[in-house]
Curated annotation (Swiss-Prot):
Gene: rimM
GO BP of this protein: ribosomal small subunit biogenesis; rRNA processing
Keywords: Chaperone, Cytoplasm, Ribosome biogenesis, rRNA processing
Annotated organism of origin: Ruminiclostridium cellulolyticum (strain ATCC 35319 / DSM 5812 / JCM 6584 / H10)
Pfam family, one: RimM
Molecular-function annotations in GO: ribosome binding
Residue ranges of domain PRC barrel in the record: 93-167
Protein name: Ribosome maturation factor RimM
PANTHER family xrefs: RIBOSOME MATURATION FACTOR RIMM
Amino acid sequence: MLEYLIVGQLINTHGVKGELKATSQTDDPQRFKKLKWVYIDKNGSLEKYDINGVKFFKQFIIIKFQGVDSIEEAEKLKGFYIKVDRANAVKLPENSFFISDIIGLKVYDENNQLLGELKDVIQTGSNDVYVVRDSDSKEILIPALKSVVKEVSIEEGKISVILPKGLLD
């Protein structure tokens, strides 16, 4: 499991006083209002930044970090990812997982046959869809429904599914 989770990306400056515009990579952008600090991933080097203010503008989050007081300073942070440590991550309901924790798990069918590796999760609104790549690099799209996904074991690196009839046809 990753120690830090991506919650957003700094995409541009906002104004001239050091604010930054960010996109959310979390289900609940309002969580930014509860954060007191975050980590900025500067190409693999994490730096802690205290948050002085958060507001929302259209689909974006406007963040003011302590010590970033000019457009020039803000410009240096553009493009970097915003991360939180697990202690500050949202508490998930039982049998729910962070996408970053399940990417890379092996996916097996009801006969314990390897289908492939989970490469991505598409969030459709109604239910997630797992993108599984098999040994021939073919993608299988599997609905992440309780009736399909029977077990997720991060410890074993495994997801067990019962495929709907006709899914592989």
